[in-house]
């Protein structure tokens, strides 16, 4: 690590702390030549392994761009898309692997998108899973319906009560 003040390569770590919920490491350093202190932040680089064999750095923006297309015309805000992108990145980082297959990125998107908007989920899933017929859509919709939490509607009973006697009005 080069000192930002004198460019000396001999620096010493004074303190290391995990930051951003484990997404980065913050290190406090000192230079042995000029004795100045500085802070560095180290991020784990996520790499996506494409089906073609090529690899590229993971970018939250690219993941959100694909979801944005599925959400077109739906009541989904940019803030919600940003939160979804963060959730996807957090899920991928939680695994701890530096290289992630593109397939895993798609799987990480499906869960949060399903909770956000079912129609957008179906649109994204139809491309991601390469739906070939209406039957594929019907199967996915049936699965969505089956996994929805059952809402139990219980009849409300109101106990019969006698009207309360009128209360005297205080004048004064």
Swiss-Prot record:
GO terms for molecular function: ATP binding; DNA binding; zinc ion binding. Its cofactor is Zn(2+). Binds 1 zinc ion. A zinc finger (unnamed) spans 3-34. Signal peptide: none annotated. GO terms for biological process: negative regulation of DNA-templated transcription. Residues 46-136 form the ATP-cone domain. It comes from the Bacteria. Negatively regulates transcription of bacterial ribonucleotide reductase nrd genes and operons by binding to NrdR-boxes. Belongs to the NrdR family. This is Transcriptional repressor NrdR. The gene is nrdR.
């Amino acid at each position: 690590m080069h000192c930002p003040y004198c460019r000396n390569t001999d620096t010493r770590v004074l303190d290391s702390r995990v930051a951003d919920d484990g997404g980065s490491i913050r290190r406090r350093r000192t230079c042995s030549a000029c004795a100045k202190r500085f802070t560095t932040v180290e991020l784990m680089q996520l790499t996506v392994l494409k089906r073609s064999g090529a690899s590229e750095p993971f970018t939250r923006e690219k993941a959100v761009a694909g979801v944005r297309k599925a959400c077109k015309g739906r009541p989904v805000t940019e803030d919600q898309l940003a939160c979804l992108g963060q959730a996807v990145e957090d899920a991928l980082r939680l695994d701890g692997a530096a290289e992630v297959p593109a397939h895993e990125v798609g799987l990480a998107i499906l869960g949060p998108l399903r909770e956000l908007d079912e129609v957008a989920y179906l649109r994204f899933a139809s491309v991601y899973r390469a739906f070939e017929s209406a039957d594929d859509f019907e199967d996915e919709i049936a699965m969505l319906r089956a996994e929805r939490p059952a809402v139990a509607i219980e009849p409300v009973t109101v106990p019969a009560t006698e009207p309360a006697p009128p209360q005297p009005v205080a004048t004064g």
